[in-house]
């Protein structure tokens, strides 16, 4: 946004203050409304501080529309009632297509629209269509272009004064743009919270160990109705204008769509997802179009709103009870509903993740009947205090998997039972384990478990694993679904006739796959270890294991302490490796794989023990960037001195060498009381000064 106005000197404080307010409001509009920031943060802060100082030195220069007034006033003892000059009416709702057709017919009949012999309207009604936001309705009052008051809907006649809180919403202008502004303007609109801002707010709530909000609407409503505006100022609220109450000093726009265009010219935020359509079919087309993009919108909506576009026709139609005859809210199917939780089972994912699943009494929600819903993980079940027998809130949004949001505690029966995570996989019977610091429990039968079969086979065939060319996902799907392959070992039992019968698999493709399988029988120990798909064991760790132990049996039988001696193997990785080989089902598949005629690799002696040095038996972790040494240089020097260089910090770590931009490893070392050294300290350590 261009800033062509000349910068006034500091010797003219009144002119300077007005100029600063203008610059800051332009920046706010570009940032919060247009989403096109054109002033660097540092420059904005400098101008803001200068304006604060000017107003402090000259209190008579403070104006209600000053950006400095957004920070909020003193804590209020309560909200003052506000009587609306024009009532804030609610809308009648429609749900089915027939409701919309009936609404259009009522409007057309009342306006005397002409129809043909079949009863169809030949002069269709013109409608303005908008989104129905899932937020909190408010009224903004501007006098001569300056924001003076904000109030909630309340009962439609009397609301609550939330002026100081609304001042903190950056997308709401404190002064309207343009030379011609009305004497009085009541803007009607919605305060809401965008999905990304809601997620960030809940992250902050969790970090501060404060209550999280259930959904963006609750967060917006709770934030707006804070007694302390300073709290509201910390909440990322937004606003969209969509209606009008009172207008004095200027003529009312002829159409609703013209009103919204005028609002944009005044600098008010207006949503762009709107259209002018004709007749019932136009309304239904808009509804379906919005429904298709609903989940991708950055904010929650619960429907769309239809309004007769022409103001004179609105006046002719008037009102019934507390709702306008000229408008209708077309609601989406409810996304949340109540039902009974009858049981909690678990399902096993492709990677072995064990997910608790709620078994529900059937409930219609989000346009479909739901009988199962995810509970995510054991910790979530505990955090939400969900028990078998509870009445629960189920949410289903679009194609998202239904989830249980929470329990209705005042309906909890006396015999409600807590969930207990099973100790064995319900699919294969292998042990279920949960590693420290992980939220997900997992089945340990990676090579054996049918639920993990496709993922295990796909990983086994990868280029960096056994490199079985021609064994893609579609072929794996067929092999598993036809029950031809249960474990990776079964791949080497496949014959030409079996493969040639697969769908869209020609004889040449079958022969090529057999050739690839034959080639894959001759591999390396590192590739074989990587192909097993052990959690947390990547290509590099597989190479380190092969180099350290020399052969497979010592790895399979290693203790956790022995695994921790391997380069870059920390406690979590060691525990994962140990669990994998402790599962008898996995050992059985490995024996099948290395049976005569199957997979082979050259084996050798374990790597020689590192020479005894000044750091023999010590474990060191490197983090951050050292001034003069690369990570590899430092690692080589430490290993030459007999130290083990680990990739993660644990209680068994002896030293942490920290450079610039050290992250979580440094924080964990400090929390555990582990000595932290810089590059100079590293050199002293290598010289034998272990302090």
UniProtKB/Swiss-Prot annotation:
Query: Lineage of the native species?
Result: Bacteria, Pseudomonadati, Pseudomonadota, Betaproteobacteria, Burkholderiales
Where is the chain membrane-spanning? none
Q: What is this protein called?
A: DNA ligase
Q: Which UniProt keywords apply?
A: DNA damage, DNA repair, DNA replication, Ligase, Magnesium, Manganese, Metal-binding, NAD, Zinc
A Pfam family that this protein carries is DNA_ligase_ZBD
Q: What Gene Ontology molecular-function terms does this entry list?
A: DNA binding; DNA ligase (NAD+) activity; metal ion binding
| Positions annotated to bind Zn(2+) | 425, 428, 443, 449
Which reaction is the catalytic activity of this chain? Answer: NAD(+) + (deoxyribonucleotide)n-3'-hydroxyl + 5'-phospho-(deoxyribonucleotide)m = (deoxyribonucleotide)n+m + AMP + beta-nicotinamide D-nucleotide
Q: Where is the active site?
A: 132 (n6-amp-lysine intermediate)
List the record's Gene Ontology CC terms alphabetically.
cytosol
The protein's matches in Gene3D superfamilies, at most eight in alphabetical order, are given as: 5' to 3' exonuclease, C-terminal subdomain (1.10.150.20), 6.20.10.30, BRCT domain (3.40.50.10190), DNA ligase/mRNA capping enzyme (3.30.470.30), Helix hairpin bin (1.10.287.610), Nucleic acid-binding proteins (2.40.50.140)
Gene label: ligA
Q: Which residues form the BRCT domain?
A: 610-691
Provide the GO biological process annotations: DNA repair; DNA replication
Cofactor(s) the protein requires to work: Mg(2+); Mn(2+)
Q: EC no.?
A: 6.5.1.2
Give the binding site residues for NAD(+).
41-45, 90-91, 130, 153, 190, 307, 331
Per the record, the domain of life is Bacteria
Q: What does this protein do?
A: DNA ligase that catalyzes the formation of phosphodiester linkages between 5'-phosphoryl and 3'-hydroxyl groups in double-stranded DNA using NAD as a coenzyme and as the energy source for the reaction. It is essential for DNA replication and repair of damaged DNA.
Which SUPFAM superfamilies does this entry report, sorted A to Z? Answer: BRCT domain, DNA ligase/mRNA capping enzyme, catalytic domain, Nucleic acid-binding proteins, RuvA domain 2-like
Enzyme class per UniProt: ligase
CDD domains recorded: BRCT_DNA_ligase_like, LIGANc
The entry's family comment says: Belongs to the NAD-dependent DNA ligase family. LigA subfamily.
